[in-house]
Amino acid sequence: MFGEPTMENNVINLEDLDTPIYRIFSLERFSNIIVSRENGLVHPSKWDDPFENFLLKNQAKMTDGTNVSLSQLSASWYGQCWTRNFDSDAMWRIYSHCKDGVRVKTTVRALFSNFYDSADKFASLKYLIGSVEYKQREEIERFLAATTFTDIALGGQPHKFAKSLLIKRSEFSHENEIRLLFHDLKGNHGKNGVAVFPFNWDIILSEVALDPRLTESEFQIEKKKLVALGCTIPITQSKLYKFNPTKIRFD
């Protein structure tokens, strides 16, 4: 499927399509994904960092110097964050603070192949995936100052605007993010800040791991629940905190 030039053109700043990527869902959300076989991308305004979606919070200047709001463009974009990080204490504590997280594994190729609707004649304008670039605050501010409305909104292609959603402050570089992006051209796909898409999890995902802080009995209980829902993907527990004691010799 990646033989389609238009699809390959919508992969931004990514060379290895078989790079493993991960995401932590809540147990409740992942259970819903198993049953519904659907995945939701959210409006960038719901992202946490105040500098996120910075372009959409600003005005841009026309070539004649007139300032215009980018809020209309804001309404038509949705995204979902993934990471190259296999296991991270910070990620578990942020996204699974109640020990109710599920880390899933896939690849850029598997995720985007399922997401990109090649039957849609406007697919090249709507479905994208890219690696986040981390920049100093001053670099971002210089980028904003030099950006015009024409730079990002005109020309018929979504790539320049998509790249603005792939910029984040360098303080967050540890997140090592990859973002799935959707441009809702007709404005009728999303609802209440969420755009839902088919998600063939049994084809896309290769691994499911539960929170490393669960006890063995808690892990077995949650594992059985997922299996009962129909999850056929191997389910393990993150070994982030596993420690095998070693005897110390006193010579």
Please give the residue ranges for each predicted region:
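Partner-binding and oligomerization surfaces adjacent to conserved cores of proteins
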Residues: M1-D251
